[in-house]
């Protein structure tokens, strides 16, 4: 998907660099970046994605989404300040041909970008959410089983694993990050699921 198309689906404060880039993946972990990725810098409990911008650049990211509060303009030059020092935005744009997008909330931007990138898969599924203190997994399995018996191909997202209508995958986190969830929902749609529990 072209970056200029993605830009229509989320709020941003600034964009420096080309809008014509073809984005092939959305990543929030620098170790998963490949050529063509859009890397979203997420501040976590222990690490900050802004500290890994250059790692993402070196492994092929075409664009980076940063927290606007990390960007500082000094004498006609813009820097992204990280724990490891500063990164010159101009160098990312000029030397690497990247786009740098400043947003107020990178986590919210990741959710909006991912939904658009995967063509809003949640809108194509009947989503059944289960909350509570005890019995969620049992209730999810029973619900999915009832739907299956009724003829509805059903995917599942759980704390231990996900099922996309074809394959079972171990869950990376008890609560998936928005881009991971959108990717799984898109796979469910691709595999013919009509429901997700």
Segments predicted by a language model, with ranges:
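N-terminal leader/targeting and accessory segments in enzymes
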Residues: 1-112
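Phosphate-binding loop of NTP-binding sites
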Residues: 102, 108-197
């Amino acid at each position: 998907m072209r970056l200029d198309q993605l830009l229509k689906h989320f709020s941003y404060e600034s964009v420096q660099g080309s809008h014509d880039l073809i984005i092939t993946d959305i990543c929030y972990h620098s170790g998963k970046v490949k050529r063509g990725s859009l890397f979203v810098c997420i501040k976590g409990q222990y690490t900050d994605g802004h500290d890994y911008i250059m790692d993402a650049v070196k492994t092929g990211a075409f664009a980076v989404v940063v927290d606007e509060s990390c960007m500082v303009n000094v004498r006609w030059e813009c820097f992204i300040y990280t724990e490891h020092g500063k990164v010159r935005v101009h160098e990312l744009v000029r030397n690497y041909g990247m786009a740098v997008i400043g947003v107020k909330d990178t986590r919210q931007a990741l959710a909006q970008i991912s939904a658009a990138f995967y063509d809003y898969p949640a809108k194509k599924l009947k989503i059944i959410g289960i909350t509570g203190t005890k019995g969620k997994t049992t209730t999810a399995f029973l619900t999915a089983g009832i739907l299956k018996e009724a003829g509805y191909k059903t995917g599942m997202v759980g704390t231990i694993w996900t099922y996309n209508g074809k394959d079972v995958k171990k869950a990376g986190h008890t609560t998936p990050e928005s881009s991971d969830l959108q990717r799984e929902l898109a796979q469910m749609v691709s595999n013919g699921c009509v429901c997700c529990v």
